[in-house]
C-alpha cells in the first residue's frame, strides 16, 4: 500500500482517540479553554450523561469572528508561538487539538463574541465533512460551545460509553478537581435540566473551607492541616489529612502543579514518608498545590497532560516531604501544648473554628475570629538572616468543640503564636518566667527531633525556651535588659557544631530516590579517584557511566541543594586544593542552611553548645531600649 497523507477528518478522529475518551474529557478540554480565556464564571449543562448534549458557557474574552474557523482546525492555538513558550507554558491548553478533535466526533456549535465586536458569531461544524459555517448570533461577551450527539459518527466508540449515571459521575469528579484548584471561579453544573453543583467563588479562607467540605467531605475539612510553605522558587500550599484522622487509603488525593491537576508518584511517596512515623501504612488524603518556575517542569509528556516531569525531581520531593513533616510536627506540638490548658480550665469551652458544613460556621465572620494559626518560619533550616523570611511554613488546625458548657473567646493572635512556639514541658511558671535568662530557669525542654544532632546537652536540664516574636527572634530578659536573639543565627551555629561533631568520623550518605545525572567533564574521573577519601568522608557517592556523572548518595545537608550544579562546583574546588576539615564543615553548613528546623530544635541545640560559644551568641543579641520607652510613656502621662 502506498504512503498517503491522511484526510483531515480521519486525522482528527485519530487524534480524538487520545483527546476525547468520554464526555468528561470533552468537558475538561472545553472548560480549560474557558479558564485560559480569563473566564470568571463557567456554566456546564449536559443531557444523558453528556452523550446527548454538552454545553459550556463562559464570560471569557471570546474569539474574534476572523478566528472562528481557524479555532476549529488542528494545531491552531493562541497559547504559544515558539519553543520557548512551550518550555514555560502556564496555560491549560497549548496543542490546538481539542476543538478540532471534538468537532470530528460530534455536531459542534461555537458561539462567541469579544468586547470589541458589536455582535456575536456562530460557527457550525459536523464530523462528516469538517465544513464550517459562520452565521451571526446573539450572545454576550464570552463563548458557548455545544457538542451534540457525541460519537454519532463512530458507533464503536459510542458503544463503549457506560450508563448515563456512570458518565455523569466522571464529569462530577472532574469538576470537583478543577473547583479545588480554581477557587476564584464560579462553576455550575446542570444535568437533564437540574442544577446539581453550584460552586460559588471562594475569595476568603472560610469560603474555601466550605468548598473543600463540599468536594472532599466534612470530615476532611474539619480535621485537615493547613499547609503553607515557600522556599526559593518553590511554593506549596493546600491541606493535609491529620495523622489522628488518617486511616487506610483515602480517595481524596489531589496534587496540582502550577494549577494543573497531575498524577505523580513523587508526591505520593513524600506523603507516605511524612506519615510513616505517625501512621505507618496509611495513604492519607491531601489537596496540595505546588507552584514553581515553569521552566523547571515539563508538562508536554502525556497525551492527556495527566503527568509532568520535574527537572529537579529529588529537590521537589524533599521540599514537599519536609514541608509536610514540619506541619505535622507543629500540629503535634500544638496539640500537646493546648491539652494542659484545657484540663486546667474545666469550666471553659473553646469555640471551634471549623465544624459541620453550615452557613453560620463558614461565614466570613470566621476571618475575624482568632484561630489556631501561627507562622513557623523558624521550622525551616535557616539561611542568611536577610533570606530567612523567604522560607516559611504555616500550620492551621481546627479546634474540636469541648463537651463542657460555657464559651469563652479565644486568646489573641499574638498570644497564640507565642504559646504555639513554646516547646517546653508543662510548667506553672508565669509568662515572665518563660522569658527569663537561662541562668534563672531549670525547667526541662525536650528536643522535637529527639536530640539527633550528635551533640550532648551541657546539663541534664536545659532552660525553658523563651517566647518567640515574629517567628524569627527569642525574647530574652537578662540583667534588667530585654534583648532579641536571632533564631537563624543560632541555628547556623548549631548546624555547624553538629556537622563538625560528625565529620571527624565521616558523614553517612543518603541514597537519592532518583539519581542525578550530569554531563561529565574530561578531568572529573581523575578528581574522583584522587579525592576518593574526602568524598567518602563527605558521604558522597559518585560514578561515571556513558559520559555522565551519576550522583547516587549525598549527606542530608545537601539533599535540598541543586545537586546538578553543586557537585560540579565541589569537584572544581577540591581539584585545586585539598580543603581543611574546617573549610569543609563551613561549606556544608552553608549548603545545609536550606534544611528546615524548628525553634525548639534550635533552642535545644543552643543549650548543647559549649558555654563559651553560648556566651558569644548571647552577646550578639540586640538590646531593646525598654527603659527609654518607659520614660517616654511616663512623661506622656
From Swiss-Prot:
SUPFAM superfamilies: ATPase domain of HSP90 chaperone/DNA topoisomerase II/histidine kinase (SSF55874), DNA mismatch repair protein MutL (SSF118116), Ribosomal protein S5 domain 2-like (SSF54211). SMART domains: DNA_mis_repair, MutL_C. The keyword DNA damage applies. One of its GO terms (biological process) is mismatch repair. Residues 388-397 have a biased composition (Low complexity). Transmembrane segments: none annotated. GO terms for cellular component: mismatch repair complex. Keywords: DNA damage, DNA repair. The keyword Oxidoreductase does not apply. Residues 365-380 have a biased composition (Basic and acidic residues). Residues 343-352 have a biased composition (Polar residues). InterPro entries: DNA_mismatch_repair_CS (IPR014762), DNA_mismatch_repair_MutL (IPR020667), DNA_mismatch_S5_2-like (IPR013507), HATPase_C_sf (IPR036890), MutL/Mlh/PMS (IPR002099), MutL/Mlh/Pms-like (IPR038973), MutL_C (IPR014790), MutL_C_regsub (IPR042121). One of its GO terms (molecular function) is ATP binding. Residues 343-411 are annotated as: Disordered. Belongs to the DNA mismatch repair MutL/HexB family. HAMAP family: DNA_mis_repair. PANTHER family: DNA MISMATCH REPAIR PROTEIN MLH, PMS, MUTL, DNA MISMATCH REPAIR PROTEIN MLH1. This protein is involved in the repair of mismatches in DNA. It is required for dam-dependent methyl-directed DNA mismatch repair. May act as a 'molecular matchmaker', a protein that promotes the formation of a stable complex between two or more DNA-binding proteins in an ATP-dependent manner without itself being part of a final effector complex. This is DNA mismatch repair protein MutL. It comes from Shewanella halifaxensis (strain HAW-EB4). The gene is mutL.
